[in-house]
């Protein structure tokens, strides 16, 4: 399943990020991809050795960790270190699949269950640059407002179309979920969403308590901690 997570960063945060990223050191984006991806990748990324990068990636981690909808949809166990990319002048990233595992500075290795893109450019400021994701439900073309995030299975083939006008800037990361299976994770998210909706409409009740009990027992049964 694919999820749109709105308002991860406020407009003020986005403006501040963009101002700081204007001063960043950018390098060839192929430095963080494998042999297959390098053949179709043509973009730039912020140098991960820079002081600015360390500060910005911490802010992204804090923002996603504090977002209730992100947590409900991803049920994250481990988050990768966020990266930042930039596309301009017809730069693109052809269809590819993300690697199944990635190195992690604290955990050694992590499994990539979910991929996330946090948009940092206003969609009207550039042409092209759509994230295209192929999954079992078809093809999805994504171009979200700045500050919004899209979450999708890392097993999906995906690409970024050429940016023919303007500049597309984004942050991206990977998530190892407590729930490895996409279908089980989607069921838990649907159950959680409906429980919260019922609570907001009707308040607490024995029926809602029973559904909460079911949710946590399923999470207990399926989670890998």
Curated annotation (Swiss-Prot):
Q: Which Gene3D superfamilies match?
A: q2cbj1_9rhob like domain, Rabenosyn, Rab binding domain
Note on how the cofactor is bound: Binds 1 Fe(2+) ion per subunit.
User: What are the protein's UniProt keywords?
Assistant: Dioxygenase, Iron, Metal-binding, Oxidoreductase, Vitamin C
Q: Where is the Fe2OG dioxygenase domain?
A: 78-177
Q: Which InterPro entries does the record cross-reference, listed alphabetically? A: Oxoglu/Fe-dep_dioxygenase_dom, PKHD_C, PKHD_hydroxylase, Pro_4_hyd_alph, Pro_4_hyd_alph_FE2OG_OXY
What the entry lists under Pfam families is as follows: 2OG-FeII_Oxy_3, PKHD_C
Which positions are annotated as binding 2-oxoglutarate?
Answer: 168
- Could you name the domain of life of the organism this protein comes from? Bacteria
Q: A Gene Ontology biological process annotation?
A: DNA damage response
Q: What is its EC number?
A: 1.14.11.-
Cofactor(s) needed, names only, are:
Fe(2+); L-ascorbate
Q: Which residues bind Fe cation?
A: 96, 98, 158
**Gene Ontology MF, one:** iron ion binding
NCBIfam families documented for this protein: PRK05467.1-1, PRK05467.1-3, PRK05467.1-4
Q: What is this protein called?
A: PKHD-type hydroxylase YbiX
């Amino acid at each position: 399943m694919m999820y749109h997570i709105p308002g991860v960063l406020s407009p003020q945060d986005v403006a501040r990020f963009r101002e700081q990223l204007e001063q960043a050191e950018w390098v060839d984006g192929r430095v963080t991809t494998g042999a297959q991806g390098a053949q179709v990748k043509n973009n730039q990324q912020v140098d991960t050795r820079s002081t600015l990068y360390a500060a910005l990636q911490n802010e992204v981690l804090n923002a996603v960790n504090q977002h209730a909808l992100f947590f409900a949809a991803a049920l994250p166990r481990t988050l990768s270190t966020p990266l930042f990319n930039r596309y301009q002048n017809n730069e693109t990233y052809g269809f590819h699949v993300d690697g199944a595992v990635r190195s992690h500075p604290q955990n050694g290795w992590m499994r990539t269950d979910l991929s996330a893109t946090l948009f940092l450019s206003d969609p009207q400021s550039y042409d092209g640059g759509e994230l295209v994701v192929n999954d079992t439900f078809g093809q999805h073309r994504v171009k979200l407002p700045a500050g919004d995030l899209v979450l999708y299975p890392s097993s999906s083939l995906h690409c970024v179309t050429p940016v023919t006008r303007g500049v597309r800037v984004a942050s991206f990361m990977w998530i190892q979920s407590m729930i490895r299976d996409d279908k089980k994770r989607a069921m838990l998210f649907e159950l959680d969403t409906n429980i919260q909706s019922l609570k907001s409409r009707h308040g607490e009740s024995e029926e809602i308590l029973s559904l909460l009990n079911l949710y946590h027992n399923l999470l207990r049964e399926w989670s890998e901690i």
